[in-house]
Regions:
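The feature marks the first
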Residues: 32-91, 188
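Short glycine/threonine-rich turn/loop motifs
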Residues: 89, 143, 147, 168-174
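The canonical Cys-X-X-Cys-His
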Residues: 55-62, 118, 155-166, 226, ...
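N-terminal export/targeting leaders of redox proteins
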Residues: 1-43, 86, 231-239
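Axial heme c-ligation environment in periplasmic c-type cytochrome domains
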Residues: 66-74, 88-126, 130-132, 174-181, ...
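Sequence context surrounding c-type heme c attachment/ligation sites in exported
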Residues: 46-56, 74, 78, 147-159, ...
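Electrostatic cytochrome c docking/interface patches
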Residues: 28-52, 66-67, 124-154, 235-239
Length: 239
């Protein structure tokens, strides 16, 4: 019975992804960077270290942010970091979301090589543990949603793309390399990102498009619970 239930949840996930890719991308391909066949990102961590000093003001030394509204970058997957930087760099000045982000102006002058070096540097940095701010039933509910989803509400399990340990998929191919590790990330940042996906704010990659479909059925309580569970985990080691 347990395996049958698990198969239904996995089936829900792939059904959802199939619908997204068979409709949205076909209709809006020009608006999205297709990561499904993306090549691995390589850069020079030493060169990235020199470029990263300006990033420390918000993201902390080595990418270990001390402010919960700024994401922790240390130990993050390089492919994810690179494609996020590309999204900021390519954003339109008239975009109501990206035009308000300080990252848009900071990324604008970066060359492709610089973005690769920055991604390589931050991914190589050892993450420090952030103080968990949640515990109890909310964390347990977040773990349940992350691992099992909620078929009745059309929510697939997050682990299908982000891995059972929230450290990213072990597949490490194509789009899966660009899914971020979420372990130990600040709850406030995760809440902001999931809310943004749910509310249909700007998405720039096919992975973003998937997240828009996944987050569509999440209510505020579910978002808070998932963020609380992720925040309770020890961060992953550097890549």
């Amino acid at each position: 019975m347990k395996r049958e239930s698990g198969n239904r949840r996995i089936g829900l996930k792939f059904c959802l992804l199939g619908m997204i890719f068979s409709t949205g991308i076909a209709l809006s391909a020009s608006h999205y960077t297709d990561l499904r066949r993306s090549e691995p990102i390589h850069g020079d961590p030493a060169a990235g270290a020199a470029k990263a000093v300006v990033c420390f003001a918000c993201h902390g030394a080595g990418g270990n942010s001390i402010a919960p509204n700024f994401p922790r970058l240390a130990g993050q997957r390089p492919d994810y970091l690179y494609h996020r930087l590309r999204s900021f760099k390519s954003a339109s000045a008239s975009d109501p979301y990206y035009s308000k982000s300080p990252m848009t102006a900071l990324a604008a002058p970066l060359t492709d090589g610089a973005m690769r070096d920055l991604a390589a540097f931050f991914s190589s940095q050892p993450p420090t543990a952030a103080a968990a701010t949640h515990a109890g039933p909310e964390v347990e509910k977040g773990s349940e949603l992350f691992h099992a989803g909620d078929a009745a509400r059309g929510i697939p399990p997050c682990q299908g793309c982000h891995g059972a340990d929230a450290n990213g998929s072990s597949t490490r191919t194509g789009q899966y390399r660009a899914y971020p590790s979420l372990r130990g990330q600040y709850a406030a940042y995760v809440v902001g990102r999931l809310t943004s996906f749910r509310d249909g704010r700007p998405h720039n990659t096919t992975n973003d498009m998937i997240m828009g479909g996944v987050a569509h059925s999440l209510d505020d309580a579910s978002i808070q619970a998932i963020a609380a569970w992720l925040n309770s985990l020890a961060p992953a080691q550097a890549f």
